Curated annotation (Swiss-Prot):
Keywords: Amino-acid biosynthesis, Branched-chain amino acid biosynthesis, Leucine biosynthesis, Lyase
Catalytic activity: (2R,3S)-3-isopropylmalate = (2S)-2-isopropylmalate
Protein known as: 3-isopropylmalate dehydratase small subunit
InterPro entries: 3-IsopropMal_deHydase_ssu (IPR004431), Aconitase/3IPM_dehydase_swvl (IPR015928), AconitaseA/IPMdHydase_ssu_swvl (IPR000573), IPMI_Swivel (IPR033940), LeuD (IPR050075)
Family matches, as PANTHER family: 3-ISOPROPYLMALATE DEHYDRATASE SMALL SUBUNIT (PTHR43345:SF5), 3-ISOPROPYLMALATE DEHYDRATASE SMALL SUBUNIT 2-RELATED-RELATED (PTHR43345)
Gene behind the chain: leuD
Length: 201
């Protein structure tokens, strides 16, 4: 998992509440177990018409937001099924941070496990960032995880909270496997001792 320290990039506004995981990545794209290649189908039913042509009015199809790395959106983002393909699709598109008033619990946890920083803010602060994001290619926002600050294009600073353990994992690029490997020496010692004391196992 890539480390997340400080991210400066374009923020895309998606002022929709209750965006579920089927909207993020529809079920027909869940056959793969690869984490790559799903970005092209992110928000598929909102990005493309029935003929597969881009819908120009959808935010991520607009030139200013095609390379967005931050998504500012509505409450209860990521509700619905627990498919891990949802954060995979966001990450493959290039989204490393999602800011919303609230998230579905499973999606929220899956984001941290896949290197995406989900930030919960009060509605009024999300509204402010949404207004900033409407500036298009001028909507450059900096998310500083170490300082737990978001800096808007006007220089304003918004503080955010994050669990210390999750923060440590994001700063150091540690998912479940990475955390386990940190204890590789201790695990090897334990297994050797177990083999010596209980050879019948």
């Amino acid at each position: 998992m890539d480390k997340f320290n400080k991210l400066t990039g374009v923020a895309a506004p998606l002022p929709i509440i209750n965006v579920d995981t089927d909207m993020i990545i529809p079920k027909q794209f869940l056959k793969t177990i690869k984490r790559t290649g799903l970005g092209k189908n992110l928000f598929d039913e909102m990005r493309y018409d029935d003929n597969g042509n881009e819908i120009p009015d959808f935010v991520l199809n607009k030139p200013a937001y095609r390379n967005a790395q931050i998504l500012v959106t509505g409450e209860n983002f990521g509700c619905g099924s627990s498919r891990e393909h949802a954060p995979w699709a966001l990450l493959d598109f290039g989204i490393r941070c999602v800011i919303a008033p609230s998230f579905a619990d499973i999606f929220y946890n899956n984001c941290f496990q896949n290197g995406i920083l989900p930030i919960v803010l009060p509605q009024e602060e999300v509204d402010k960032l949404m207004d900033d994001a409407e500036r298009g290619s001028n909507a450059i926002i900096t998310v500083d995880l170490e300082a737990q600050e978001i800096r808007g294009p006007d220089g304003g600073v918004i503080k955010f909270d994050v669990d210390p353990f999750r923060k440590h994992c994001m700063l150091n690029g540690l998912d479940g496997v990475g955390l386990t490997l940190q204890k590789e020496a201790e695990i090897a010692t334990f297994e050797k001792k177990l083999e010596e004391t209980q050879p019948w196992l």
